């Protein structure tokens, strides 16, 4: 046996890539300095993997922003509006991801979507009628050569052609089949060039194979690979899958003339059963046995049992997916050893792979014994009172009365808001001063009184500014919060927090997911203090801002000893207490964000309700089911594809929902109309994940497009997400344009 990984974290042990890239974005360093720093980081990572004893090391898993974007640029899948910009190649690359607004033009960023069922986001490629697919880039070759110069012959990694086409937007009238042949030809050129450079093997990632496949999609996949594999240019080809099993195409996949196939034995419910039916003797099986998405130690006995049952003769032990989705290393953490021993971040998972390989070769008895002893321990006790509360829940606990239509009338009279009410999603820019002051308080360098005075000043300034700009429903800005999940987790039992557990979410944006260690209950009121203070500074309604139970669960590293359903319901009871406290404090509009609702939705439609929505939607309803009819409940959802779960979202029984719509050209509105969506809606009228400032006319045009699909009585005007990561000047300029556009639209009603 040998060992490998599908991919390694890119941003660095201390987020080096983030900080150097942001310097480049601020024009503080030239392009050459950014590229050199990235080169140094890649070398460091390759050497870490090599020194850990991993026998096959990937390359081209690094990205300056996103690996799907990298593939699009490699094959010249670049919209004409960006191609025509007189910018460097790197500037065009970032323009696709972030938009561009300057002397040389004004283009919007490409849409972002969730990467399958993770909190990573990819930039959606776009193929237009004039797109000429060809080999245009050189990143994959440069990085292979870099590693080779270090004495490391790597296995280059590239998004496979089928998945790349599946993730691409096509101009009207075009389909993937129109471009399959030209894309296959370009991949063939990649094979040829890599072979010339001395590569022995290439990894083509095809995670789209774990989804439901139509007959047409299967035919396209087979057409692509039968052509591509007809001339491999001397390379060995590994088709790598992850995030599930390949039940729809296992027979056809294993019949292809590939050299190796990577299968997920962690999330792939049927992978073991599929392999048990037989695996070709002339192929190598890359067995994804170490969880690439969670941070708990691998149970060696269980993994060895799975490996022992595999009938394949040639097996490589690997991770279930790229290690992009876990933090870098536990070496920088400060947990007690009794806690830390239960965790394995990316670097530690390399050791787990090596241990499993050694044990299989009869050389890892010490490691196996230590692992058995770890799993023999009772890690954490259970909360009996909490278990009783959960057991006592009935249908009425998940039902809010009166029904939506009656509440809508009551709230309209009570709140007395104008048509097209304006609001924001919750957070305002967290400047360097905000972050440094919070850090000083956490370190004990300033007193609680000093910190509170600072937060009050920030809140006062932004409440006053919102009144000045004439927003209808205000927010307090969340200056006291570091992260929308961690802030709540710090006030809940059962949570642990890493010091340096950063994971890439999109571009240079990192998140630090907390760890659910035990049973979850609320320790004390969390948000009432600052929501009440903000409300005392204005006569306009100020939204209470909460993170919903499903999102808290999905943006944490969950337990593996109980179901995620049970953990989510525990969190729901805790957040319910907070909702009722806010209501008692006089907060009349309470937003319960479910930004990550879709994230753990199974990739196969047949599992959507039974495995997820049947408990995730009730968990949200449990949180707000007992508030008064005149308390308005909002929710917010981030970048995801919602069009196919519209009825489930309506069934959340919120009064208002806001969501991303601007980057995706408001396509969700047609589905809302078709499904007779009842909840009031705030489709984001501009994209906050790009630094460009939308013009008033641009926002006005978006508002008119919304009003063409949604009754004016049900429309709210807001950005598409929180503003914490944006600059203050661009934020204020954009929001002023938003309110101006909304007022202009009202006059036309």
UniProtKB/Swiss-Prot annotation:
Binding-site residues, L-methionine: 425-427, 478, 593
InterPro entries assigned: Cbl-indep_Met_Synth_N, Cobalamin-indep_Met_synthase, Met_Synth_C/arc, UROD/MetE-like_sf
Binding residue positions for L-homocysteine: 425-427, 478, 593
CDD domains per record: CIMS_C_terminal_like, CIMS_N_terminal_like
Catalyses which reaction(s): 5-methyltetrahydropteroyltri-L-glutamate + L-homocysteine = tetrahydropteroyltri-L-glutamate + L-methionine
GO MF term set: 5-methyltetrahydropteroyltriglutamate-homocysteine S-methyltransferase activity; zinc ion binding
Pathway assigned in UniProt: Amino-acid biosynthesis; L-methionine biosynthesis via de novo pathway; L-methionine from L-homocysteine (MetE route): step 1/1
Cofactor: Zn(2+)
Free-text function comment from the UniProt entry: Catalyzes the transfer of a methyl group from 5-methyltetrahydrofolate to homocysteine resulting in methionine formation.
Family, similarity comment: Belongs to the vitamin-B12 independent methionine synthase family.
HAMAP family per the UniProt record, alphabetical: Meth_synth
Protein name: 5-methyltetrahydropteroyltriglutamate--homocysteine methyltransferase
Organism of this sequence: Streptococcus suis (strain 05ZYH33)
């Amino acid at each position: 046996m040998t060992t490998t990984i599908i991919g390694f974290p890119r941003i660095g042990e201390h987020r080096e890539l983030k900080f150097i890239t942001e310097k480049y974005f601020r024009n503080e360093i030239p392009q050459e300095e950014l590229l050199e720093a990235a080169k140094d980081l890649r070398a460091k990572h390759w050497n870490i993997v090599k020194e850990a004893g991993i026998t096959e090391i990937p390359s081209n898993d690094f990205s300056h922003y996103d690996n799907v974007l990298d593939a699009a640029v490699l094959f010249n899948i670049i919209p004409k509006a960006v191609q025509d910009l007189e910018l460097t190649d790197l500037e065009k690359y970032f323009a696709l991801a972030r938009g561009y607004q300057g002397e040389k033009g004004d283009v919007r960023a490409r849409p972002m979507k969730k990467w399958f069922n993770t909190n990573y986001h990819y930039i959606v490629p776009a193929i237009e009628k004039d797109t000429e697919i060809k080999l245009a880039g050189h990143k994959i070759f440069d990085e292979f050569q870099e590693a080779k110069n270090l004495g490391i012959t790597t296995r280059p990694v590239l998004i496979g052609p089928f998945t790349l086409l599946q993730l691409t937007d096509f101009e009207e009238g075009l389909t993937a089949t129109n471009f399959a042949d030209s894309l296959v030809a370009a991949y063939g050129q990649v094979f040829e060039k890599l072979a010339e450079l001395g590569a022995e093997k290439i990894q083509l990632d095809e995670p789209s194979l774990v989804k439901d496949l139509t007959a047409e999609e299967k035919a396209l996949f087979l057409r692509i690979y039968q052509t591509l594999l007809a001339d491999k240019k001397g390379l060995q080809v590994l088709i790598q899958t992850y995030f599930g099993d390949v039940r729809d195409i296992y027979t056809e996949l294993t019949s292809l003339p590939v050299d190796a196939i990577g299968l997920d034995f962690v999330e792939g419910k049927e992978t073991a059963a599929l392999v048990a039916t037989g695996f070709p003797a002339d192929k190598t099986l890359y067995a994804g046995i170490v969880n690439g998405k969670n941070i708990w130690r691998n149970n060696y006995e269980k993994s060895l049992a799975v490996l022992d049952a595999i009938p394949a003769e040639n097996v490589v032990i690997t991770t279930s997916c790229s290690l992009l989705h876990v933090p870098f290393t536990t070496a920088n953490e400060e947990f007690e050893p009794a806690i830390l021993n239960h965790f394995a971040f990316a670097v530690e998972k390399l050791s787990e792979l090596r241990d499993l390989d050694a044990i299989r070769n009869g050389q890892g008895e010490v490691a196996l014994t230590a692992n058995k002893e770890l799993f023999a321990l009772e890690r954490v006790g259970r909360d009996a009172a909490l278990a009783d509360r959960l057991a006592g829940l009935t249908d009425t606990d998940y039902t809010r009365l009166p029904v939506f239509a009656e509440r809508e009338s009551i709230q309209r009279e009570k709140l007395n808001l104008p048509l097209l009410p304006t609001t924001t999603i919750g957070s305002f820019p967290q400047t360097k001063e905000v972050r440094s002051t919070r850090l000083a308080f956490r370190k004990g360098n300033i007193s609680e009184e000093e910190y509170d005075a600072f937060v009050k000043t920030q809140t006062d300034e932004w409440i006053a500014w919102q009144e000045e700009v004439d927003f209808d429903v205000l927010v307090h800005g969340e200056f006291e919060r570091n992260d929308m999940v961690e802030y709540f987790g710090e006030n809940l039992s059962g949570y642990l927090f890493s010091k340096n557990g950063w994971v890439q979410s999109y571009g240079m944006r990192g998140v630090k997911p907390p760890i659910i260690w035990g049973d979850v209950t609320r320790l004390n009121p969390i948000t009432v203090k600052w929501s009440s203070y903000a409300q005392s500074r204005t006569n306009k309604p100020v939204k209470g801002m909460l993170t919903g139970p499903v999102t808290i669960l999905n943006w944490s590293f969950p337990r593996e000893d109980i179901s995620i359903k049970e953990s989510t319901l525990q969190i729901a009871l805790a957040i319910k207490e907070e909702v009722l406290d806010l209501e008692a404090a006089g907060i009349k509009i309470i937003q319960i964000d479910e930004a990550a609702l879709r994230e753990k939705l199974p990739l196969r439609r047949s599992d959507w309700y039974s495995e997820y929505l049947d408990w995730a939607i009730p968990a949200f309803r449990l949180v707000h089911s007992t508030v008064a009819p005149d308390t308005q409940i909002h929710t917010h959802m981030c970048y995801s594809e919602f069009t196919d779960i519209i009825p489930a979202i309506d069934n959340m029984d919120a009064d208002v929902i806001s969501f991303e719509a601007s980057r995706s050209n408001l396509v969700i509105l047609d589905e809302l109309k078709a499904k007779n969506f009842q909840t009031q809606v705030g489709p984001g009228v501009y994209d906050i994940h790009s630094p460009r400032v939308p013009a008033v006319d641009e926002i006005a045009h978006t508002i008119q497009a919304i009003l063409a699909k949604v009754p004016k009585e049900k429309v709210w005007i807001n950005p598409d997400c929180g503003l914490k990561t944006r600059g203050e000047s661009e934020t204020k300029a954009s929001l002023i344009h938003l309110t101006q556009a909304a007022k202009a639209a009202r006059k036309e009603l």
